[in-house]
Amino acid sequence: MASEQLARRENTTTEKEIHVEKHRVPKMATHFEHLAEQAKESDITAGKDTPQGSIEALQAGERVKDHAGKAMGDIGGRGKARETHELGAHFESLADKVTDHAAANVVGNKESQREARGGVRDVGKFEMRTEGGEKGNKDRPELKTRTREVIGRTEKERGRESGGQVVAEKGRETETARGRVGAENEGARTTAVITCTLEKGGGTQKPIREEERESESERSAWEQISNYSDQATQGVKEKYERAKQAASETLNTTTQTAQEKSAQAKNLAAQAKDATLEKGQQGYAVTKDTISSAAKTASEKTAPVAEKAKDYTLQAAEKAKSAGGTTASYVGEKAVQAKDVAVESGKSAAGYAAKVAADLRDKATAVGWAAAHFSAEKTVEGTKAAAHVVEGAAGYAGHKAAELASMSAGAVKGLAASAGETAKEYTAKKKEEAQRELEAKKPSQPQEAEERPSEGIGETVRQYAQKPKPSEGNPQKEGTGSIVFTAIGETVSSAGEKVKKPFKNTMGGESEGGGGKEEGKSVIGKSLTSIGEKLGDAKQREELLDNVTGNITEGGGEVLGAVGETVAEIGQNMMKPAEIVQERAHVRQAGGVLDAIGETIAEIAETTRVMVSGEDERVLRQSVVLETRVTGRAKHEEGSHGA
């Protein structure tokens, strides 16, 4: 029988390998909810589908316990008590494991039934897949009763009827539907299932006690699973609530922080604004105070400066006024000093002024005669030049006109030469006499007058003469200035009269000539008479006196030099009319010779008068008009005589 049993066991189909793939479930709550559903389904079908394999396994465990003594006595055969004892203990531990995992096996059986329908499902962190399809479903009853091969050998020593050796091995997982052993075991792939096959068939009745115990263990397992599921769900909910609360608190904290920061920013902005306004007001006040103080300081500094400037202006005005008064007083002081000096020396101020005036008169006389002498020389030269020019012009006229021109030219030339020589000699004589008288009078002057510088005397006389004295002043001082002006005027007038007389005498000696000669003489006489009258005019005397007085201010020794320069200018101006006469002589006829000579002399006299008197252009224009009239009159007379 042992051989038959062995052959039957060798024909047993090989177990089907079921691969368990590990898959990680993202959410723990989903897993526990799935386990809860499985628990509910198992409660419904608890009495209907009881897996036989698990019950047989339990029975086999009990039987293994009952026959443990026999097995331990038979195995080894030769006093191997220690090994037998260890093997018995091992079987007991295996039986305990089978008992402990009964509920897990029940759950696995339920899941295996679902897998019979095919498909893939998740259990915990594992993905369960059934291979084989319909074939696997057909082989399921056979898989439930599958066992490990047990080779038993009978021992002939004791002569027992049957003997066997039960060898229990750990093998590979034999369940088609693999369940998860224990809710807490997440990665276990192998489970130990021990099935024992007894050689002697026994009854397969299921004790009631075992069923009750299995039910209780199953309930406890499902209760534990439910508790675990509830705890996990509650934990997830608590975590979710805590996370939600933390997020809400974080949001509230963030909002509150943002509000606080915003309020702080507003407060800081308001404080900055207030500080800026305050600083601006302070700066404005400081600037205002600075500007006002600067303006006040400037006004305070400017006011004294303005006052000083005003005072300085007033002082300058006072100084100018006082300077004017000082000048006037200086002139008066000089006059008084001159008077005091004259009184101290035994002479009155009038006598001293008379002597000074006499000295100036003598000097002016000498200067006048020198000027007259020079003028006479220039006049003679101009007349001679005019005569030569007329002679040249007369040569172009006809024969009769040439004779008349020659006669007229000879007469005029002789007249002018004689008159010029006479005037020249007379002026030279008067000049020498005046100089001798001046030199003779110098030793007779008082010692004090000689010691006084001529510049001081000239300045005193000029200031005293220019500044008119008040009417209530000393009449003796006014008389002194008048004496000086009168003396100089008389000197110039007498010089003019003396220059005029020789020309009159010359014209009187030649009055017995022809009609043409008489007309020429009359023209010359008129010209010379006008010269004398102009030189003797009061206005001429005053202007000449002013010029002489102005030159006297530079000192008595510089009077002759100034007069010499004036006479030189007079001579240059005298040459210009001679050139004009020469130009006119080329275009005039012989009958206009006397007119040309008369006009030349008149122009010379007029130029002399203008240079001496210093008249302006208006007087020169009047002289030109007068010259034109004289020329027109001469032409008219010439035309009447020609007719």
Swiss-Prot record:
Residues 237-279 form a coiled coil. It comes from Glycine max (Soybean). Residues 105-262, 426-480, 501-522 are annotated as: Disordered. Keywords: Biotin, Coiled coil, Germination. Residues 111-161, 169-187, 207-221, 426-442 have a biased composition (Basic and acidic residues). Signal peptide: none annotated. May serve as a biotin provider for several growth-limiting enzymes that are necessary during seed development and the subsequent germination stages, and thus may play some roles in determining seed germination capacity. One of its GO terms (biological process) is cold acclimation. Expressed in the leaf primodium and the vascular tissues of the hypocotyl-radicle axis of mature seeds. High protein levels in dry and mature soybean seeds, but not found in fresh immature seeds. It comes from the Eukaryota. The gene is SBP65. Belongs to the seed biotin-containing protein SBP65 family. This is Seed biotin-containing protein SBP65. The modification N6-biotinyllysine is found at K125. Residues 223-234, 247-262 have a biased composition (Polar residues). PANTHER family: LATE EMBRYOGENESIS ABUNDANT DOMAIN-CONTAINING PROTEIN / LEA DOMAIN-CONTAINING PROTEIN (PTHR47877), LATE EMBRYOGENESIS ABUNDANT DOMAIN-CONTAINING PROTEIN _ LEA DOMAIN-CONTAINING PROTEIN (PTHR47877:SF3).
